[in-house]
Amino acid sequence: MNQSLTPSAGTDSKTGSSKAISFQDYLDLSTLDWARLRAILAPALYVDYTKIGKEKWDAMSADDFMAMVSNDDFLGDPCVKTQHLIGATYWERVSESKVIGHHQLRAAHQVYTSPDLKTVKLRGHSHATNEHYYVKSSGVWKFAGLKPEVRWNEYKFEEVFKGSYTQSEKHS
């Protein structure tokens, strides 16, 4: 894996982007490698969760993004295991320094009763498309945001995250 995330031999000639960065960001999310994820983030991210019942941030700081995704109410929950698989993808070149990746995703989630990960409490999987935004900063491609759109969910996806919008609605 090209750790610097610069375009490599696998670079798409039309976009100038590297498929390595999209693989890297999903690997980091699936393994919960927060340091590696932080290393590929742009200083500010466009985060649009409106299609999944949450908010939109036009310029969320990388630190705030990390705090959100690594929080115990989200992917930082030690009882949640996840794997994000990328399906069909196409790249849209916006400029020499901005690319949008359009990705088909399946995100599998399993919640355990305790951090020892021995007993499964529930499963929840999501099938979605996702726009990922990438910017080139100092010659290096960085992950600059996302905009998911869920097509459909399996099992009890709405119960996977303690901080999920459905959990919040149950308490209001």
Curated annotation (Swiss-Prot):
Pfam families: Scytalone_dh
Alphabetical UniProt keywords: Lyase
Highest taxon of source: Eukaryota
GO biological process: melanin metabolic process
Keyword Oxidoreductase: no
GO molecular function: scytalone dehydratase activity
Coiled coil start-end: none
Binding site for substrate: 49, 130
Stored SUPFAM superfamilies: NTF2-like
EC numbers on record: 4.2.1.-
UniProt-annotated catalytic positions: 84, 109
Family from the record: Belongs to the scytalone dehydratase family.
Function per UniProt: Scytalone dehydratase-like protein; part of the Pks2 gene cluster that mediates the formation of infectious structures (appressoria), enabling these fungi to kill insects faster. The product of the Pks2 gene cluster is different from the one of Pks1 and has still not been identified.
Subunit structure: Homotrimer. Each subunit contains an active site, located in the central part of the hydrophobic core of the monomer, which functions independently.
Name used for this protein in its record: Scytalone dehydratase-like protein Arp1
Organism: Metarhizium robertsii (strain ARSEF 23 / ATCC MYA-3075) (Metarhizium anisopliae (strain ARSEF 23))
Organism phylogeny: Eukaryota, Fungi, Dikarya, Ascomycota, Pezizomycotina
